[in-house]
Amino acid sequence: FGVRGANGVILVTTRRGKEGKAKISVNSSVGIQMPTRMLEMADSYTYATLRNEIITNDKPNATENDLVFDNYAVERFRLNDDPIMYPSIDWRRYLLNKTSVQTQHNLNISGGTKDIRYFISLGFLYQNGLLKQFEGVGYDNNYKYKRYNYRANLDFDATKTTTLKIGIGGIVGNRNEPMINDATNSIWTLINQTTPFSSPGVIDGKLIVTPEERFDNKINLGNSALPKCYGTGYSTAINNTMNLDLLLNQKLDFITKGLSAEIKGAYNTSYGFTKKRKGQVEQFMPFYQSSLEDPSLGYDSPDFNKNIVYKIKGENKSLQYDETSSRAR
């Protein structure tokens, strides 16, 4: 609570204990978090059809070679009969849960005797993120936040005219989040920019990505959400803030009735610690076997082998470790 002071300043004071039996109060709440709105994005068939339509509108005599997606790819998207080679993924449903949980709990205890009074408060807040947990990464890749807060106010009547008030309080916050392998875009932006055919997802613990040569390098598949958040590591930050204040009040009624003197002291400290683990996993690109052995064969050839084989994209997986800490008083 507080009162309005001069120039509009609000003076806030924490609760203090009163003489009497101990009073205990407990408050708990559970909430459900969800996005206010989720965009509905085009599937692969709709995307490919409209993208080709743009070209034919600009160039009515366009041939199949002029199109971004050939007839075979469009048909695969339409039938959805080859989801590894020609996927159609709704990345919001694939990467995000519909809801997440938030909980908050508070415990207050107050009471005391004529000479000693106390007020103690403990609180806990937990917020879970919306990212789904990937299997096989070996760590928690979701957004999460835990906060612990505490407050203890003690009033001692050392004598009939001397009162000592001690207050200690603080907040400990623990934040976990994925290491997004993108310096400028958030996970939400990346999801909006990811095409539905850029990857079939994680299969048997392996990150599968669509090679750009699948569409003759006519479309950029690089700015995809999954490769930038799967196996890229995580960041944990701990922040600890503590406040201590002392007040000594001495009544001076022997000089003038109602006169008193106060001595105040305060000590504040804060500490921060951040741990970052950056990783990179192998990315596997699927190909039809005949596409690698004899690129001259067409899909409609009776000798065309549609067994799927994988090539590794980029370098092998690696791990980087970084820790930073800070302290202030």
Please provide the spans of the model-predicted regions.
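Membrane-proximal, glycine/serine-rich, low-complexity loop/turn segments characteristic
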Residues: 1-241, 247-250
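Small-side-chain secondary-structure face that scaffolds active or pore-lining regions
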Residues: 125-147, 177-182, 237-243, 254-329
